[in-house]
From Swiss-Prot:
This is Homeobox protein MSX-2. Its main location: nucleus. It comes from Rattus norvegicus (Rat). Pfam families: Homeodomain. Belongs to the Msh homeobox family.
């Protein structure tokens, strides 16, 4: 099927084919991206000519790489959120939202010296009923 009659993909017939970057070009692009995520027009012109690429190819590569970096950062943040969530049974929720691992840590540590929850102490003695047993559990 020719590009002009293709109904699945609607694009210009004079579209340039996908550029297969060489390994050395990719390494240089990644190195430059680590240094600076946004290039000025002059930097892009100089950099693209040094790699034998067009300015548009470099511009699009940087756009795609920024999108990838954002996606990876959001995935990492989601992992941290999942790791920071307490393992609670389903249907059980906290009375306050925890939006970040740092917030969760600060909630627990900020109240530590002053508002520690006090658990009831079971009675101890000769006639004390063991914890978990009541008069209804005796047979």
């Amino acid at each position: 099927m020719s590009p002009t009659t293709c109904t699945l993909r609607k694009h210009k017939t004079n579209r340039k084919p996908r550029t297969p970057f060489t390994t050395s070009q990719l390494l240089a692009l990644e190195r430059k991206f680590r240094q600076k995520q946004y290039l000025s027009i002059a930097e892009r012109a100089e950099f693209s000519s040094s790699l034998n690429l067009t300015e548009t190819q470099v511009k699009i590569w940087f756009q795609n790489r920024r999108a990838k970096a954002k996606r990876l950062q959001e995935a990492e943040l989601e992992k941290l959120k999942m790791a920071a969530k307490p393992m609670l049974p389903s249907g059980f929720s906290l009375p306050f939202p925890i939006n970040s691992p740092l917030q969760a840590a600060s909630i627990y540590s900020a109240s530590y010296p002053f508002h520690r929850p006090v658990l009831p102490i079971p009675p101890v003695g000769l006639y004390a009923t063991p914890v978990g047993y009541g008069m209804y559990h005796l047979s």
